[in-house]
Amino acid sequence: MKVSATLLCLLLIAVAFSSHVLAQPDAVNSPVTCCYTFTNKTISVKRLMSYRRINSTKCPKEAVIFMTKLAKGICADPKQKWVQDAIANLDKKMQTPKTLTSYSTTQEHTTNLSSTRTPSTTTSL
């Protein structure tokens, strides 16, 4: 009887522990990207497409990861002036309106249901 009571207690403890592990939020188990070393070279802004800041408490260093036009991630020190200038330049590019192609709809004279589309270039304001 003592053996079955002990086994029952162990089983209950195992079930309680496993449900606690399964109830953890997904973010706890999600992978974190960290930079352990930084580039020693200044990267031309012309080669850069985007960036993201890394400031997770799980990472040893705060960093910026630049994505190049060739889809390569490069870790950089956010305290360096060229990194701050590149971030400002990329932010400015994102705010600058670009030329967009839109389509104007012209109704055909024979029927009201059909339409033809002709591309026209416009600039957003």
UniProtKB/Swiss-Prot annotation:
SMART domains in UniProt: SCY (SM00199)
Entry's Gene Ontology BP terms: antimicrobial humoral immune response mediated by antimicrobial peptide; chemokine-mediated signaling pathway; eosinophil chemotaxis; inflammatory response; positive regulation of cell migration; positive regulation of synaptic transmission, glutamatergic; sensory perception of pain
Ranges of compositional bias, category Polar residues: 97-109
Alphabetized InterPro entries for the sequence: Chemokine_b/g/d (IPR039809), Chemokine_CC_CS (IPR000827), Chemokine_IL8-like_dom (IPR001811), Interleukin_8-like_sf (IPR036048)
Keywords per UniProt: Chemotaxis, Cytokine, Disulfide bond, Glycoprotein, Inflammatory response, Pyrrolidone carboxylic acid, Secreted, Signal
Compositional bias ranges of the Low complexity kind: 110-125
GO cellular component annotations of the record: extracellular space
Family the UniProt entry places it in: Belongs to the intercrine beta (chemokine CC) family.
Protein function: Acts as a ligand for C-C chemokine receptor CCR2. Signals through binding and activation of CCR2 and induces a strong chemotactic response and mobilization of intracellular calcium ions. Exhibits a chemotactic activity for monocytes and basophils but not neutrophils or eosinophils. Plays an important role in mediating peripheral nerve injury-induced neuropathic pain. Increases NMDA-mediated synaptic transmission in both dopamine D1 and D2 receptor-containing neurons, which may be caused by MAPK/ERK-dependent phosphorylation of GRIN2B/NMDAR2B.
Protein name: C-C motif chemokine 2
Natural source organism: Oryctolagus cuniculus
